[in-house]
From Swiss-Prot:
Pfam families: Acyltransferase (PF01553), GPAT_C (PF19277). It comes from Pseudomonas entomophila (strain L48). A motif (HXXXXD motif) lies at residues 309-314. This is Glycerol-3-phosphate acyltransferase. It is an enzyme of class 2 (transferase). GO terms for biological process: CDP-diacylglycerol biosynthetic process; fatty acid metabolic process. It comes from the Bacteria. SUPFAM superfamilies: Glycerol-3-phosphate (1)-acyltransferase (SSF69593). Pathway: Phospholipid metabolism; CDP-diacylglycerol biosynthesis; CDP-diacylglycerol from sn-glycerol 3-phosphate: step 1/3. The keyword Cell inner membrane applies. The HXXXXD motif is essential for acyltransferase activity and may constitute the binding site for the phosphate moiety of the glycerol-3-phosphate. It catalyses: sn-glycerol 3-phosphate + an acyl-CoA = a 1-acyl-sn-glycero-3-phosphate + CoA.
Length: 828
């Protein structure tokens, strides 16, 4: 465009048209002027071809009185038609770049200076940035088109000019004297390459300073994945198995890599930060963060893997937002392939999401590529985030860990442990989860729908509701090397084989998953909705008068302050009255007024929904609730007997609720809780004997409500054991027992009006049966039928009668005894 007078004329007209809209400024003109030798020829090097960039540089040079890039320049006998060149070739319309040789202008300049010792040329790398620094831009639409590390095409450049042109900045780097490079006497080709390398460093350093570091790894990683020995072997195996050429199998591996890899860009992170800042403060009443300082302390020098609990689709974005706001690098996030949809998938990918298929079975090549991708992230120190629960919890409980990602992480660490790995549990608590109504349908028995990010958009119509606050607590970090030292001493010296899959991998991974789940529960953020749900769902009519509810909430707060669950658990501010006011403001409580005051209750829809929020903190109250349960049927008990019964039930409660204490710690914790119950007047103590208050007293009502927090869990335990005992030895398989438990629970929920669909959740029964097997109480025979130890009868009758009412035990036994008989209508 600038190589002839006519082209310069056209270029000038284009520049004038451009500046009808564009406004630009030079950032460091004075420093450039001080270092520029006006007696020497000047050439401007631009990073990549762009007519608009050139027009802006020409405008700024004219304004500053600097040599214009579009005018001819003489270097000794060499006459160049213009004083600029592009360091890299022009991308096509799709943004793809063809690697070619050095710029012809640079080739000619090096040759001319090499032949004429008295000549020199100053090359000024110059960069044009469209829009403000991403760190200071506040418009989400402008951020989408701000400069980034990605290669851009013409269409994106045009949109950048239109949207960002009025905030354009030009930055000149210090001049590079070509004579200094030529005098190294490296020869023509090496000198040209050296000049290119110096300029690339200039451009990279400047871009890093202006828009942040290049943390987009897709272009670097995907091509490198197929060169790993393990992936190459998988490609060869694929070619042989499918009878296809190696090149076709390699292309398949590259396709998998592109499907998986994130396309992390700083600009997208800033865009999401702007949007989410509005979201958290418009939809929610902000985000409260606790214990992030410990993460800031361990992040340097460690590979950090964030393992949050999973309650909502917005969990994906929340953690990245918080880390970015607190000066920590946002992680690369494992996301289901179902979220890789048009527009949304691209934005998530640029925000750090990498996508994984639901199952790797039957596809060893995909498995190898995915494993290598994660290994590369780990060894290069990129922070990573994944959910050990797999999917979102629909019940509010901590789900049983899915160990797939943990196993991949563990194998990667065994392969290379140079970078220490630290797991950081992150508890995310919502006072009202966005997908609550969707979960409500599933809790009521609707089939679980396929996960989709569009679940969020389905609740837009409900955004007029108050959603309260979001709480994010960072839990106690788990250092993987230290964990392995405890579980498998000497693991560093063991022969692990080419696949890094030792015999102890599965068992150790399971324990790691359980440890992560316990640390997540330790970091629970207890909020007003949790406590109100816990209190009202423990009543027979889902209702209390305001003063009674206030007393219950004050009791719970006092107990938790006296015996904190863990140092990472947080409590709500205020007293019981303040908690009620807060929950009423969220329309989660109904009220009825009369002359005696207000009655607060849960309507039918909210009663089911509130089980979700109760379950968030059920583990916190499991042990005090269990202790209180012993006094519903016994007026007094000795400390020794209490300890014996708690120890009998604790393995099953711990397995279901991921309680934090080891069996060795249990006695000390029991004593702490007994002391707290005594101090609050719920028990009396005489030497080694504990006694309940009078049944007609207010304290006994409070003790009863506390006991009912754990009653449904104990009922499920008793159902399973009663069915086994009534069926006899070696008559039921684990699957048959599970199905019978579900049917029995459904019937009992009708008979006793239990408005909690999770009561008959088959996964809870399945896990209880598995725990009985692990504890040696059950043992499958060769046909898979379950035999049981004498301890089962002791557990069912000796312990259960201490914690469940006679009416409940009788009802369960009757249903178990007559399970094969036609059932009568419960109304008759």
């Amino acid at each position: 465009m600038t190589r002839s007078p006519l082209r310069r004329l056209i270029f000038g007209a284009l520049r004038r048209v451009l500046y009808l809209w564009v406004r630009s400024e030079t950032i460091n003109q004075s420093s450039l002027t001080l270092k520029l030798d006006r007696s020497r020829p000047v050439f401007y090097a631009l990073s990549s071809p762009s007519l608009t960039d050139l027009a802006v540089v020409d405008h700024e040079c004219t304004k500053a009185g600097l040599p214009r890039p579009v005018l001819p320049v003489a270097v000794g006998p060499l006459q160049e038609p213009a004083g600029f060149f592009y360091l890299t070739p022009d991308p096509d319309w799709l943004g793809r770049q063809d690697k070619r040789g050095a710029p012809p202008t640079l080739e000619r300049l090096v040759a001319a200076i090499s032949q004429h010792a008295e000549e020199d040329t100053q090359i000024i790398p110059v960069s044009v940035f469209w829009g403000q620094t991403p760190a200071s831009e506040s418009s989400p639409w402008k951020l989408l088109f701000a400069d980034s590390w990605a290669v851009t095409g013409r269409l994106r450049r045009l949109l950048s000019v239109l949207i960002l042109g009025r905030k354009t900045r030009v930055q000149f780097s210090a001049p590079i004297h070509l004579r200094e490079l030529v005098d190294h006497n490296k020869g023509h080709e090496r000198t040209v390459r050296m000049a290119q390398r110096v300029m690339r460093v200039h451009f990279r350093n400047l871009k890093t300073a202006v828009i942040g570091p290049d943390i987009s790894h897709r272009r670097n990683l995907v091509k490198g994945l197929v060169h790993d020995p393990l992936v190459r072997q998988a490609i060869s195996d694929e070619a042989e198995r499918e009878k296809i050429p190696y090149a076709k199998a390699e292309a398949k591996a590259l396709h998998y890599g592109n499907e998986i890899a994130s396309d992390y860009t700083y600009t997208a992170i800033r865009f999401l930060e702007v949007v989410l800042s509005w979201f958290w403060n418009k939809i929610y009443d902000g985000v409260k963060v606790n214990h992030i300082e410990q993460v800031q302390g361990i992040a340097p020098g460690h590979e950090v893997i964030y393992v949050p609990c999973h309650r909502s689709h917005i969990d994906y974005l929340l953690l990245s937002y918080l880390l970015f706001r607190n000066g920590l690098t946002p992680p690369h996030i494992a996301a289901g392939i179902n979220l890789n949809m048009p527009v949304i998938g691209g934005l998530l990918r640029r925000g750090g999401a990498f996508f994984m298929r639901r199952t790797f079975k039957g596809n060893p090549l995909y498995t190898a590529v995915f494993n290598e991708y994660l290994h590369t992230l780990f060894t290069k120190g990129f922070p990573v985030e994944y959910f050990v629960e797999g999917g979102r919890s629909r019940t509010g409980r901590m789900l049983q860990p899915r160990t797939g990602m943990l196993a991949i992480t563990l194998r990667s660490f065994l392969r290379s442990s140079r970078t220490p790995i630290v797991f950081v549990p992150v508890y995310i608590g919502y006072e009202r989860v966005l997908e609550g109504r969707t979960y409500l349908g599933e809790l009521r028995g609707a089939s679980k729908k396929k996960e989709s990010i569009f679940d969020i958009f389905k609740v837009i119509g409900a955004l007029k509701q108050r959603f309260g606050q979001v709480y994010v607590n960072f839990g106690e970090p788990i250092r993987l090397a230290g964990f392995l030292d405890e579980q498998q001493p000497g693991w560093r010296e063991q022969e692990l084989g080419p696949q890094f899959r030792p015999t102890w991998l599965n068992e150790t991974t399971t324990r790691l998953g359980e440890t992560v789940a316990r640390h997540l529960n330790e970091a629970a953020a207890i909020n007003p909705v949790n406590l109100v749900a816990l209190a009202l769902l423990s009543t027979s009519r889902l209702a209390l008068d305001e003063r009674a509810l206030t007393r219950v909430l004050d009791l719970y707060l006092a107990l938790l302050r006296q015996v904190p669950y863990s140092p990472h658990t947080t409590l709500p501010e205020g007293d019981g009255q303040a908690l009620i006011k807060h929950v009423l403001g969220m329309d989660l409580l109904a009220e009825q007024k009369d002359a005696m005051g207000r009655i607060l209750y849960l309507d039918e829809a909210n009663a089911v929904l509130m089980t979700y929020y109760r379950n968030n903190v059920l583990h916190i109250f499991a042990l005090p609730g269990l202790l209180a349960s012993f006094f519903l049927s016994s007026s007094r008990m000795s400390r020794d007997l209490l300890g014996q019964y708690v120890r009998a039930l604790y393995p099953y409660l711990q397995a279901e609720l991921f309680l934090r204490w080891t069996p060795e710690q249990l006695d000390e914790v029991i004593d702490q809780w007994l002391a707290a119950l005594v101090s609050q007047g719920l028990l009396r103590q005489e030497n080694d004997i504990y006694m309940r208050p009078a049944p007609s007293s207010r304290q006994f009502v409070l003790l009863t409500l506390l006991a009912r927090t754990i009653t449904q869990t104990l009922q499920r335990f008793y159902m399973a054991t009663s069915l086994l005992l009534n069926s006899g030895q070696h008559t039921l398989s684990a699957e048959e027992l599970e199905e019978l438990c579900v049917m029995m629970a459904q019937r009992l929920s009708i008979l006793h009006g239990l408005n909690a669909p999770e009561f008959f959740d088959k996964t809870l029964f399945r896990h209880f049966i598995q725990t009985l097997v692990r504890e040696g109480v059950l043992q499958p025979d060769g046909d898979g039928k379950l035999g049981y130890h004498d301890k089962l009868a002791e557990l069912a009758e000796g312990v259960a009668k201490r914690v469940l009412s006679a009416e409940l035990r009788l009802s369960i036994r009757q249903v178990a005894l007559h399970r094969d008989e036609p059932q009568e209508n419960p109304e008759t």
